[in-house]
């Protein structure tokens, strides 16, 4: 991204697009949470995903007036909820091995099918809690707000 400046170009284009459609904070964060959850199904490493997504989404959200911490919080919600259903997870083989102690036929499909309802429930509950947090205007951390002061 440094050589081509593609991250900056995508961030500017994305910020302009979201400004033009006048999307609110909560719908934007829900879209980002779902995108993060979807990306997690294909890439297991949270830090590698963040290294790919952060150069685009952090500046994009900052241009929209939202703090980088808010962006990372939304990313972590989406990322954490689908960890158990992605075969790309580092410990997926270990989980299958433990499950096979109790059911010799357990495999990838068994674990994924068993965990999808939990994953969806976590995703829905965390997203609702996140929306309530935003509506309440609570800070994310010490000296950290939801919004990024422009100029």
Identify the role of each PLM range:
Residues 10-13, 47-60, 89-102:
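Re-entrant/interfacial helical elements at transmembrane boundaries that shape
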Residues 6, 48-49, 69:
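Short, surface-exposed helix-loop/turn micro-motifs enriched in polar/charged residues
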